[in-house]
Amino acid sequence: MILLRAAHFALVVALAGGLAFMLCVARPALAQAAPHWLELRERLTRFALWDLALVAASGALWFVVRAAEMSGVSLSDARTPRFLGAVLEETLFGRLSLGRLALAAALGGALLALRRARPRQETLLLALSTALAVGLLASLAAAGHGVSEEGVDRAIHFSADAVHLLGVGAWLGALPVLALVLARTAPQVGLQFATAVVRRFSAFGMISVAALALSGVVNAAYTLGSLPALIGTSYGRLLCAKLTLFAAMVAFAAANRWRWTPRLAQAARAEALLALARLRRNTLAETALGVVTLGIAGALGVMVPAADTQTIWPFSRTLDWSAVAAPRQVLFAIGFASAAALAAVVVGVRARSTEWIVGGIAVTAGAGVAAIWLLAVPAYPTTYLHSPVSYSVASVARGAPLYAEQCAVCHGAFGYGDGPGATALAARPPYLTPRVTARREGELLWRLGHAGEPNERLADAQRFDLLNYLRALANADAARRLDTQAEPWRPVSAPDFTFQISTGPQELLAQERGRRLVLLVLYSRRHSLARLRALAESKPRLDRLGVRVLAVPLTPADAVAADAGGIDPGMIATPDASLVPVYAMFTRTIVEDRQIAVRHLEFLIDRQGYLRARAMDPGAAQWSSMAELLRQAVILDREKQRLPAPRRHAH
């Protein structure tokens, strides 16, 4: 499958690149040599037709294999007309294949007409053929990872894939034709023609490399997820190999542009012929590297992106900006020295000065070593690992007994290091809250599994739940300063939970992110009915401000009927069973550093998923007036957007 995909991509790349080379490079360069142009046009058009035939054959085979893979049937069963017809009609891949087949058929007709075209028709037919080939190449983006995104991300990723393919076609696809022209046409027409072709192609190539670099950065943002994934995942390591080959291709292209092309026009004939031979050799080397790169791209296209896998760090050290003990100005000085040294290398290359080149490289290497020494910190295999378990009340509730059994005896109920077993230790256990917020998720998971406490009897799933409980402890500590005022902002993430309104579908709190504010009301029959009726009366105004009210009972016995008088049934929710005990963790205050037995509890949650305000009495002075609650909602509605609260632990 990988080889078939890579072969098909390579054939389409060569087809589009060859036609683009004819239109934008060869034809303008041979404007004064009509017989040579006609001969080259005939040869390249014939090659394009053969290439198109191979594209059609490989595309048909790829379609059959892919259809069998998607449906889980054998190749023999996948070759039946009925099965293939169903795939063509009922799947996105099939409909895209039909569209690509139509493009290929139109391209075949345009190429046949181009072979017999008169000079007046030639430009139009060549431009049409190139446009159809470019469309065929860009359509391959539909086979990339971009189509798995949604909304705006899908449009951006898909567009970046298409631009990347076009850049590959314009550069790599044109290299075989350039090598052919330099080997056959240039000796016949002259060195002046070779110079014009290479210079035109250099400009063409620089635009292509820029497009490849920019689109590659966008693609990496979606498929990598983080820089450590370049080293810590199979996808990232294969991408590193691709980038290495790309850098080698750029080096050959730079040698052609800055060293050998000037010698074609300025040197004696013998040296010019040597330069022409070097240009051909480097072009063939670029082509060979490009073919291997396409093979790697074919493998990357069918692999799970690094962003969707776990990063396993292979080294005992990593780099961390926050670890710098020296003043940050030292790093800026190192960066300035590196930039100056690189500039010296560029000057040395242009001036052909060995001293400048060697000196610049030495300073750059020294600055790099100094930066690594300053930023290096200990690392573990799980340093960049992310828990697959989201921060939810269900996970926190599962982690609570684990903490009580494994940690509380030394660390205490709230992680202060004041547990009953702490006095028997040589050193007091550390205060957990700052450690939880300051360390990466993967580092915490490693310590949970390898430190003295808890021991390795915990399974992976238990470690993930224990980590979420520790995160809830840290958030509850930060929430001690919450009151009925939404400002100032504090990084207190609201644990996610499921709920159901009447007989409607189950929903998640996280689904309200970016959409509405949430007023979460934990009520009791004895103390909250008047408050619920007041909220129901103000619901139209709350709706206009984008505030959704979710009222859940403190105990099952407190649940009110959906048809209770004066209470809006759209507010009454059946919650996750773990919601009340987990959100009760957020009742600690600066005055009372313990969980308070509440009769009524309200949280105002912003659109990013952060707890912003809290009222722990149905008659709280600030919220007893509905106007004050509405004022807090207006403040949140108008404030500048922040990054959403992480659904997992964030460093």
Report the location of each language-model feature:
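Short active-site neighborhood of thiol/selenol oxidoreductases, capturing the structured segment around
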Residues: 286, 508-536
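Polytopic transmembrane helical bundles with strong interfacial aromatic enrichment
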Residues: 1-375, 380-382
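The canonical Cys-X-X-Cys-His
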Residues: 286, 291, 399, 404-413, ...
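Periplasmic/extracellular electron-transfer cofactor-ligation site
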Residues: 394, 404-427, 450-451, 473-478
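Electrostatic cytochrome c docking/interface patches
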Residues: 379-402
